[in-house]
């Protein structure tokens, strides 16, 4: 049964992943993970028939990720502008929405001339930062590997950001807040893990129990420019997550842009619908020009 589940996952990935060319795949940790794996069994797709179709297309999810990795999707060399983004799919830290919040995002980034680095971080895990640091360690390592390979992958090391969806949006915010975190089982590194920008899409876990930003995510002026999107009728990760985080960014004098929409729900990725929220990628592209990640170089903070 396990071998059949893995074969089914591979077939679904082949059918559902867009034509964007994957150039490299690297393990995040060439040897063992910093902590012993708690995952039992091979990678599988836990999607059921009831939630397999989103906006008329198949959705592929992955769980039991014990060997975290990154996959690099490079744009057409004629369009490559040197900018890049790490992509963290969501899935409640239980699974990863690998195509709707992963490979399809890479296809969009490549259309903008950007390199996409899709991060397959460890799931499921027992909680998330700060109770569990494995997700942050994977995110840090992915950013450091990307900067270390910047020349080889034709990337400007000072124009590398993060894009996260749902739980992945929380992970993006954690990385931006704690790029210098030192895991006790992780060798020290001089390579900076701080992103140059972050895009936080329908985030969860940013709001604390007191109605303010989570204490573990209290922004400082070192947080990079931030773009946020959420729907008011998001009943999975409520809109208060974006509201309190935006206010905390404003208080810390971090450049931030917030887009709230009446309808949209949760987990829509970039798939088009007849709702205004489907226009968020165009808003994000304009914002990337505003902060000079795209277009002429500008005053983006350098690590």
Model-assigned labels for residue ranges:
Residues 81-90:
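Short beta-strand element of the alpha/beta-hydrolase
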Residues 96-98, 122-154, 273-278:
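Catalytic nucleophile-loop/oxyanion-hole region of alpha/beta-hydrolase
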Residues 99-117:
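Short amphipathic alpha-helix adjacent to the substrate-entry channel of hydrolases
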Residues 137-221:
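Primarily recognizes the serine-hydrolase "nucleophile elbow" in alpha/beta-hydrolase
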Residues 243-246, 250-303:
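C-terminal catalytic histidine-bearing segment of alpha/beta-hydrolase fold enzymes
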């Amino acid at each position: 049964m396990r071998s059949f589940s893995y074969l089914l996952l591979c077939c679904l990935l082949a059918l559902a992943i867009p034509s964007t060319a994957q150039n490299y795949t690297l393990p995040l940790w060439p040897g063992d993970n910093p902590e012993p794996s708690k995952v039992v069994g091979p990678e599988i797709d836990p999607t059921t028939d009831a939630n397999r179709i989103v906006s008329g297309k198949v959705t592929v999810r992955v769980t039991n990720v014990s060997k975290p990795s990154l996959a690099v999707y490079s744009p057409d060399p004629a369009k490559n502008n040197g900018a890049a983004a790490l992509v963290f799919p969501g899935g409640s830290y239980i699974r990863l929405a690998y195509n709707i919040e992963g490979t399809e995002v890479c296809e969009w980034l490549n259309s903008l001339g950007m390199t996409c680095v899709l991060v397959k971080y460890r799931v499921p895990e027992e909680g998330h930062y700060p109770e569990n640091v494995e997700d942050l360690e994977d995110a840090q390592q992915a950013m450091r590997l990307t900067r270390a390979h910047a020349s080889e992958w034709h990337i400007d090391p000072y124009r590398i950001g993060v894009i996260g969806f749902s739980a992945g949006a929380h992970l993006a915010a954690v990385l931006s807040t704690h790029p210098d975190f030192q895991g006790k089982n992780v060798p020290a590194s001089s390579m900076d893990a701080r992103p140059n920008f972050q895009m936080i899409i329908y985030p969860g876990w940013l709001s604390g129990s007191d109605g303010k930003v989570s204490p573990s995510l209290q922004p400082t002026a070192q947080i990079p420019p931030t773009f946020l999107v959420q729907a008011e009728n998001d009943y999975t990760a409520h809109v208060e997550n974006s509201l309190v985080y935006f206010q905390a960014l404003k208080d810390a004098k971090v450049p931030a842009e917030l887009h709230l929409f009446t309808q949209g729900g949760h987990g829509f990725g970039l798939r088009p619908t007849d709702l205004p929220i489907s226009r968020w990628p165009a808003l994000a592209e304009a914002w990337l020009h505003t902060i000079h990640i795209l277009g002429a170089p500008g005053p983006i903070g350098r690590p």
